[in-house]
Amino acid sequence: MRYEERKRAGSGPKSVRRLHLTKCSSRARYLVAFTILLVGAAALAQSLYKYQDENGEWIFTDMPPEDQQAAEIRDLPTGSKPPSVSVSTRIVDREFQFIAKNDYYAPVEVVLALDELTNVRHPTADQVMRWVVDPRSEMILLGLTTTGTDPEPAARFRFMSLFGDPRSRHDPPRPYRAPFPVAASYNITQAYPYGVTHDTADSRYAVDIAMPVGTDIHAARGGIVFEVASTNFRGGTDPDRDAASANIVRILHDDGTHAVYAHLNWNSIRVKPGDTVERGQYIADSGNTGFTSGPHLHFAVLQNVGMRIESVPVVFEGPDSRGIEPAMGQVLTAY
């Protein structure tokens, strides 16, 4: 099923805008406007019902079974606040500074737009208003000279942010490992160029692999985990209701691209942001969460190409380390 990187599966990286009116004094007062990039990892505290349907399939839902059959009831934890990217301002020695803070274990691209400046000199016409902020860091984006104190220097501004460094280039050292146990084989139900629902730039080269709920998912390539959503348990074909309820793992690669593993099972993810994972490492169980018509894994490798996310073609490792291009209807085996 469709997994739009900016809209689907509970929180893909998306451009965000915020309008701020900030006044700063020489005491360097801060007004920090937090911009949440990811939603969906946090869930309200509620009950989970687990039971088997008439076909013996395990059902995870927030509704009790209609026929009064026995069901296991669990309390779901309240999710923690996801990381964020923020831009704040301060005055230091008559310089009006714009500071970006990136809480993620991945770089983010930030674009700043200045709508109104009061007693602050405008940047020069050739000033580039786009930066890449390193993981888990703060960066002074811009420093402008103040021109007075009455009224206090102020700025009205907007910013957008997106995962990834646009200077990155997809350069895997070897074909990707099929993301499930060695010697197992599963059908590819969607792959380029026959994407039934993969019709956006960020999903064009995504691969959907049908597999039973609970199948071990292994990292197709090593890297650093920078986002996890694990508390969702609902799946369905209603985009308004289900789009933001997929469990996912994102892993940053050393070439600046990242992989997303989506529709994972409830409470099955075995990694956390900041973890370094190796190729082939067990990271989660497959599931049927989010916008989906049936159990499968959605796998894609993504790249920031300048405030825009695009998927890139992937090749899986086959026999004798030979590269295999995924195709719809193909049986993929892990080696």
Predicted regions and their residues:
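Short hydrophobic beta/alpha edge segments that flank linear recognition/processing sites
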Residues: 249, 278-290
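Acidic, glycine-rich catalytic/binding loops that coordinate metals and/or anionic ligands
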Residues: 173-189, 218, 241-244, 269-278, ...
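Short histidine-centered loop motifs in beta-beta connectors
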Residues: 212, 218, 255-280
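N-terminal signal peptide c-region/cleavage motif recognized by signal peptidases
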Residues: 40-42
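Short, cationic interaction patches enriched in Lys/Arg with P/S/T/G and frequent prolines
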Residues: 3-6, 24, 44-97, 103-140, ...
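Surface-exposed, glycine-biased beta-strand/turn segments
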Residues: 128-245
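Active-site loop architecture of trypsin-fold serine endopeptidases
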Residues: 232-241, 286-298
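N-terminal secretory signal peptides that target proteins for export/translocation
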Residues: 1-27
